[in-house]
UniProtKB/Swiss-Prot annotation:
Notes concerning its domains: Contains several highly conserved motifs that are important for catalytic activity including the aspartate-rich 'DDxx(x)D/E' motif and the 'NDxxSxxxD/E' motif, both of which are involved in complexing metal ions to coordinate the binding of the isoprenyl diphosphate substrate in the active site.
Motif NDxxSxxxD/E motif per UniProt: ranges: 221-229
Lineage: Eukaryota, Amoebozoa, Evosea, Eumycetozoa, Dictyostelia
Catalyzed reaction equations: (2E,6E)-farnesyl diphosphate = (2S,3R,6S,9S)-(-)-protoillud-7-ene + diphosphate
Region listing for Disordered, in residue ranges: 326-359
Organism name: Dictyostelium purpureum (Slime mold)
Low complexity bias locations: 335-356
GO molecular-function terms, A-Z: (2S,3R,6S,9S)-(-)-protoillud-7-ene synthase activity; metal ion binding; terpene synthase activity
EC main group: lyase
Pfam family, one: Terpene_syn_C_2
Protein name: Terpene synthase 1
InterPro entries per the UniProt record, alphabetical: Isoprenoid_synthase_dom_sf, Terpene_cyclase-like_2
One BP annotation, GO: terpene biosynthetic process
Gene name per UniProt: TPS1
Keywords on record: Lyase, Metal-binding
Amino acid sequence: MSLSLSDIKFPESWELIPNERNYIDYVYKESVELGVWRPDNKRDLIAHNNVVSLSKFFWPNMDFERLVMGGELMVWFFTFDDALDAGIYNDEQQAQVVKRMSDVFMNGTVEDDASGPEKMALHLRNKCEVMCGERKDTFNRFISSCIQWVDSIIPFNKIKIDGASPDIELYSYLRKINIGAFPCVTLTEVMLDHEIDHYVWYDPRWIKMNEDIAIITTLINDLVSYEKEVNDNAGDLNPLFFIQKQRKVPLTESFKEVVGLINHWVKDFTNLEESFMKSHKFKNSKQKRDFECMLEHLHYLASGSKLWSMQTPRYCSPTSPFIEMRKQSSSPNLTNSISIPTNNTNNSNNITSSPNKKQKIDITSSSAIFTTREIIN
């Protein structure tokens, strides 16, 4: 049986050529110095290269400095989320870990025993604050979107009731926040020295376009991760899998339904985009171009997710149901778990200035290690 991702139809204007990859090594060195990855660890390096390569698809036209910021966001996303998914924390500990990370963005501080992901979050937050300058509203939108994403992780992980998969509508509603698209969009706003009027961000069409792209990106991710999640006994939160179970249909029918949903949201997005561009009165050509850059980023989140998925060892497999992804991974056979120390490394040449410190809060002894699972097979 062969399924094809070509059934997903994007407008030609959404096509992209990925950016350069020279930023990946730079972000790796940063991540080691911040204690996110272990130095000279091959598995961590492979994991890093996989997840950080997303940035060149999401920001294909940005310069090196901004690509690095996108890479830092990807490192933070994957390591923090996978730590909460790893099963090493009970409910109370998870809530404390989430509160600590929210405080990093809220207050711009870390604890004395800050984890690698917490230090990466502060590092990126500080960069964004400097880049925003007087654009306080832009900075606030970025940190608010990051806090919103952090707060979404535990509720999404508890979406199953009595072990049953959710309905696709409930799944999509929660996942559009949990997928992490909104921090990518607000980071793009940080990257642009724009002249867009503040009220644009509260236009319901702009908000809905963001939600549409988040759902599209979610469903693409669910398609390409299907084989991996089923093999890892994690298919109950994958629509391609749970639609089969709920409706007692074969994989081909489930795939057809998911693709239909993607194409529906693409059409809804393009209608909203056309409506906005026809009705909005831009003050000058720069303001219009700035907004077009924001729209392009939304396009690239969807099309970039698809392109990245067709080449990453994270999902590609000779036995994938998708013909575009049937590639022999060149990565070594790794275990499903990668232990990542979160304390400071022995490298004394830290890339950041000393962050503001708060009084240490003891979560548990297990907080010394984040276990990042399933970054790569």
